[in-house]
């Protein structure tokens, strides 16, 4: 009888555990909503005269679970000199935005099914008398938690996707280009610009945009060494927003370095070297220049040879003394 009661208790315990695990798994599966959104075009750069407007057709795709989305436009500004931006809470400046869709409006939620897409017709209007300059915005599509029967939002993943809009307001269409090289420097562990022949030579190039319109640098960094040897490294063109600074990279890209640099020179270097930058910003734009130099010597190799020589001489003398 006791064995029967024990088996019954074990059976009931297993039933409870199984039921609990089944509920937890189902609950996790129900709550783990997948959100996968895409928007195109991801970037718009345009010049608009005051009193004019343009219409941009965006395609918003949902590859995840059905979701409720809200489209809105906010301003952004440079966050640092690495190209990162900081979104603001609302749209600032004179530019006006609206949706030309019959059933959609900005800041109003709408439903998007799985594997469905929605076209957002964004009208960008610049009123008369708007001051010239650059204004930067992001079109955001954000998921909105669905409201349950008891007025409580359901637990689901929060997702936001953005498409940046770079607006230049100009009466004549002329762009102000005022660049400056604020840093063209080698990062050396020593006080002087001296490197070991086998070490990586890191270079930092930072440009400043002192104008009211964004600029896009082009050009190259040239390395010249002994006997007239040289190598060119092309500047990677990236936008520098108005009145901001940005670290500029050259190919081969320095993105894999542990520190933020523009170019990582690797190989075997010996003797004096000169680095020069020649940068332009399109046709009829000013060229800006900068240069620096460094010296390379195989200190580690020479130190290793000296150490091996000293050890060898010591061993030879030791054996000679033992034989005597």
Pin down the residues of each PLM region:
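Short proline/glycine- and polar residue-rich coil/turn motifs
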Residues: 48-50, 109-118, 236-247
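Short beta-strand elements of extracellular/lumenal beta-sandwich folds
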Residues: 50-65, 197-210
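Membrane-proximal extracellular "stem/stalk" segments
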Residues: 171-303
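Ligand-binding face of N-terminal immunoglobulin V-set domains in extracellular IgSF glycoproteins
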Residues: 55-59, 67-74, 95-153
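Short beta-strand and strand-turn-strand segments in soluble, beta-rich domains
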Residues: 36-40, 84-108, 223-236, 287
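Short acidic, flexible loop segments centered on an aromatic residue
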Residues: 65-94, 208-228
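N-terminal edge beta-strand
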Residues: 33-54, 180-197
């Amino acid at each position: 009888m006791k064995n029967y009661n024990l088996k019954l208790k074990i059976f009931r315990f297993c039933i409870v555990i199984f039921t609990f695990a089944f509920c937890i798994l189902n609950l996790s599966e129900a709550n783990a909503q997948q959100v996968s959104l895409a928007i195109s075009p991801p970037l718009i750069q345009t010049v608009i005269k005051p009193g004019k407007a343009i219409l941009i057709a965006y395609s918003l795709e949902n590859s995840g679970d059905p979701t409720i989305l809200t489209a809105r436009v906010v301003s952004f500004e440079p966050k640092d000199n690495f190209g990162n931006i900081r979104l603001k809470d609302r749209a600032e400046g004179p530019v006006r935005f609206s949706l030309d869709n019959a059933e959609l409006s900005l800041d109003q939620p709408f439903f998007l099914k799985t594997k469905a897409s929605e076209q957002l017709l964004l009208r960008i209007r610049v009123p008369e008398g708007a001051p010239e300059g650059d204004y930067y915005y992001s079109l955001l599509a954000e998921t909105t938690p669905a409201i349950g029967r008891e007025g409580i939002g359901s637990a689901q993943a929060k997702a936001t996707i953005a498409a940046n809009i770079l607006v230049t307001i100009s009466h004549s269409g002329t762009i102000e280009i005022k660049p400056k090289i604020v840093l063209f420097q080698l990062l050396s562990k020593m006080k002087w610009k001296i490197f070991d022949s086998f070490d990586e030579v890191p270079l930092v190039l930072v440009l400043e945009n002192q104008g009211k319109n964004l600029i896009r640098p082009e050009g190259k960094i040239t390395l010249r060494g002994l006997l007239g040897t040289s190598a060119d490294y092309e500047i990677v063109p990236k936008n520098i927003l108005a009145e901001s600074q940005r670290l500029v990279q050259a190919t081969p890209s320095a993105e894999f370095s542990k520190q933020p640099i523009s170019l990582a020179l690797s190989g075997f270097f010996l003797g004096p070297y000169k680095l020069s930058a020649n940068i332009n910003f399109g046709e009829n734009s000013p060229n800006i220049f900068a240069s620096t130099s460094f010296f390379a010597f195989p200190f580690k190799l020479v130190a290793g040879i000296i150490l091996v020589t000293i050890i060898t001489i010591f061993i030879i003398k030791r054996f000679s003394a033992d034989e005597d």
